[in-house]
Design a protein with these regions (language model features):
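A conserved acidic beta->alpha catalytic loop
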Residues: 14, 23, 38-47, 64
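Short, acidic, metal-binding catalytic loop of nucleotide-sugar glycosyltransferases
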Residues: 22-31
Length: 340
């Protein structure tokens, strides 16, 4: 058994592998076994892996594009390790990036998962959207980070360099105990992509396990590798999966109120996209997401019952009680440090 397995999920990402895999190997090979799980790529990814990296990388070939969530589930079933580190192919790692993560996990057995600090490849003094310095949720399920709220991304001045318990750690660079991963049920493959790591981390927190950001470790992220922000499918998956996650994970006494408010807020967002941004694609995507959630919600009733049966605490501090929309748009609080 390996102590740590870095698993990079790839689909037609040969350019990212060519650019960033050498650095992963350079700065990780002494502390981890590196795997690339390929989601049935049709580019030259497998040719590259089997020729240039055949001695350094273990390749897992999947039979089709299973997406991010189920792709990782399929791949990790074939990996025997104490810790998994799920790593995007568009991550540039840094010297000694693994040491703080490993030492922290070894020293804190009640921590199920952690992440490094995530900075932008293109603006290297800025946090990166997908996880920054650790993730939180507001009362209504809107995610935000230390260093990023909605589209406001902060400059990294060391203001969030303390280890912090969080609600969720980024799926771009997620270190997790294998036992916790499978005990919690893994990533929800039905999500395909988007919100899946938040859903998993919330389930871990419900079970009484901790999730942390360890900013002594930092990496650089390109971002937008699954779907570009302008793609309506990204909007669809984000809304559908976020609603599904809320249905699965909300406490019983909050479920009705939060889901009712989200009905109002989602349609408000849709019309804002249409009227102010003239974005027909995203407008339709929100309506499609609401319909999809309505139709498949019944498929998650058993999931909800099982998750609630594992609940160790009614309230999780990193799921904040305020409305992020109110704080951001009405109060003008656009930095994490300004939030109540």
């Amino acid at each position: 058994m390996d102590k740590l397995a870095i698993v990079i999920l790839n689909w037609n990402g040969v350019r990212m592998l060519q650019k960033y895999l050498p650095t992963v190997l350079q700065y990780s090979r002494d502390e981890a076994t590196v795997y690339v799980a390929d989601n049935a790529s049709t580019d030259f990814s497998l040719e590259l892996l089997h020729t240039r990296y055949r001695e350094e990388v273990r390749v897992i070939e999947l039979d089709k594009n299973w997406g991010f969530a189920e792709g990782y589930n399929k791949a990790l079933q074939q990996v025997d390790a104490t810790y998994y580190l799920l790593l995007n192919s568009d991550i540039e790692v840094t010297h000694h990036w693994l040491t703080p993560l490993i030492e922290f996990m070894d020293a804190h057995q009640n921590v199920a998962a952690c992440q490094p600090k995530l900075l932008s490849v293109y603006h290297r003094d800025n946090f990166e959207y997908a996880g920054a310095s650790g993730g939180f949720l507001d009362r209504y399920g809107y995610p935000f980070c230390r260093g990023r709220i909605f589209d406001t991304v902060e400059c990294d001045n060391g203001q969030y360099d303390t280890v912090q318990d969080v609600l969720w750690a980024t799926g771009a660079a997620l270190m997790i105990r294998a036992k916790d991963y499978w005990d919690a049920g893994g990533l929800d493959g039905r999500f395909f992509a988007h919100n899946e790591e938040i859903d998993l981390c919330w389930r871990l927190r419900i079970r009484g396990r901790r999730v942390c950001c360890v900013p002594d470790s930092f990496v650089y992220h390109v971002g937008g590798g699954t779907l570009p922000k302008s793609n309506p499918m990204k909007t669809y998956l984000n809304f559908r999966n976020n609603l599904t996650m809320l249905y699965k994970c909300l406490p019983d006494d909050e479920l009705h109120h939060v889901m009712r408010m989200r009905w109002f807020l989602d349609y408000l967002a849709a019309f804002e996209m249409l009227i102010l941004k003239r974005n027909w694609g995203d407008f339709r995507a929100v309506f499609r997401a609401r319909r999809a959630f309505k139709h498949w919600r019944k498929d998650f009733e058993a999931d909800r019952q099982q998750i609630q049966s594992t609940r160790q605490t009614a309230q999780i501090a990193e799921r904040r009680t305020f409305s992020l929309l109110w704080q951001y748009y009405v109060k003008g609080r656009k930095r994490f440090s300004e939030l109540p």
